[in-house]
Regions:
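Hydrophobic alpha-helical segments
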Residues: 1-230
Length: 230
């Protein structure tokens, strides 16, 4: 545990807002999952990240007694997938992805990845500063929108489908495009946590705190430590 005297008031407020809004969205109906399912999957992602002795990547969390609620609203394979993504991302393979998406819609899988990618940075940020965790609120009623863009295509750079034309942007840029609302939330967080997309091409851009070089050094180090190999 990090000992620190930092308060939430000392954190940039645009970053606080981005995190609050992203976590709040987890309990609302999404594109392919209900609010109850999204909240449930978010809690499984939190479990995966926080466990001192995590379940092995080849073991489905849904098969382990007393790990998940007895009554689940999301399919067990979705819980197994988000647990593994959240804790054992370096072990994922295309064969595993194809097995999962044989049982759940590939676009629902994209949204599931977005839930994991919302939980992980917020938890890590707050834990590193000794701040209390943000709680996922009660689930809101309503049905998923099932909003599917017209021009969804297969990609070479990603396992998941993307909005075409494919592979004109980096894999990380096009990864969530097939689920626009998830894409919007993830990039709103990225703008606050890292660099606004429109500023990415400027090597001298800064908020007046860290320089671009310093930011890239930290980002590279975090990526290496987290085994982010994209």
């Amino acid at each position: 545990m990090v000992n620190t005297t930092i308060s939430l008031g000392e954190v940039r407020q645009d970053l606080v807002r981005a995190h609050n809004q992203a976590i709040a969205a987890l309990s609302k109906p999404g594109t392919w999952w209900t609010g109850a399912q999204r909240r449930e999957l978010a809690l499984t992602a939190q479990l995966a990240i926080s466990e001192l002795e995590p379940v092995a990547p080849w073991v489905g969390i849904s098969t382990v007694a007393n790990k998940l609620p007895a009554s689940l609203t999301a399919p067990k394979i979705a819980h197994d997938a988000i647990y593994r993504i959240s804790r054992h991302a370096a072990t994922l393979t295309r064969e595993w992805y194809e097995k999962v998406t044989a049982e759940i819609n590939p676009l629902a899988f994209v949204e599931l990845c977005g839930i994991a990618c919302t939980i992980a940075p917020v938890m890590a940020f707050r834990r590193s500063l000794g701040l209390p965790a943000l709680e996922v609120g009660s689930a809101e009623s309503g049905q998923p929108s099932n909003n599917e863009p017209d021009n969804i295509v297969a990609a070479q750079l990603n396992w998941v489908p993307v909005v075409g034309p494919a592979d004109k942007d980096a894999a990380v840029v096009q990864a969530f495009t097939a689920v626009p609302e998830t894409n919007r939330v993830i990039w709103a967080m990225a703008d606050a946590q890292y660099i606004p997309d429109k500023e990415m091409v400027d090597p001298n851009w800064t908020r007046g705190t860290l320089s671009r070089v310093q930011m890239e050094l930290i980002a590279t180090r975090v990526s290496q430590q987290r085994e982010c190999f994209y």
